[in-house]
């Protein structure tokens, strides 16, 4: 049996930190313009009304309003922001 670890096992003990992806604002939650709604890799969810998409596929609100999750079609989800007119 070896009494030293060997070079391979000591070099392999690293792990990268999690990327903090996922939904940041949930359905019927109030958001302001510019708030991030979803961080994702690829288009798991697509932008709907009043939602923009960044170059890393992050979805964010374009207006102040309430988040609404809905189905775009059978297997695609869509995120929209519905404006709230407070007695105007």
UniProtKB/Swiss-Prot annotation:
GO terms for biological process: translation. GO terms for molecular function: structural constituent of ribosome. Coiled coil: none annotated. GO terms for cellular component: cytosolic large ribosomal subunit. The keyword Phosphoprotein does not apply. InterPro entries: Ribosomal_bL27, Ribosomal_bL27_CS. Residues 1-21 are annotated as: Disordered. Gene3D superfamilies: 2.40.50.100. Keywords: Ribonucleoprotein, Ribosomal protein. Disulfide bonds: none annotated. Belongs to the bacterial ribosomal protein bL27 family. HAMAP family: Ribosomal_bL27. This is Large ribosomal subunit protein bL27. It comes from Helicobacter pylori (strain G27).
């Amino acid at each position: 049996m070896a009494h030293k670890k060997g070079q391979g096992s000591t070099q392999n003990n690293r792990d990268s930190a999690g990327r903090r992806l996922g939904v940041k604002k949930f359905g019927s939650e109030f958001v302001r313009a510019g708030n991030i709604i979803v961080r994702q890799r690829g288009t798991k969810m697509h932008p709907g009304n009043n939602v923009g998409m960044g170059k890393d596929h992050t979805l964010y609100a374009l207006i102040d309003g309430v988040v609404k999750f809905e189905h775009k079609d059978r297997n695609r989800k869509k995120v929209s922001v519905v404006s709230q007119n407070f007695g105007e």
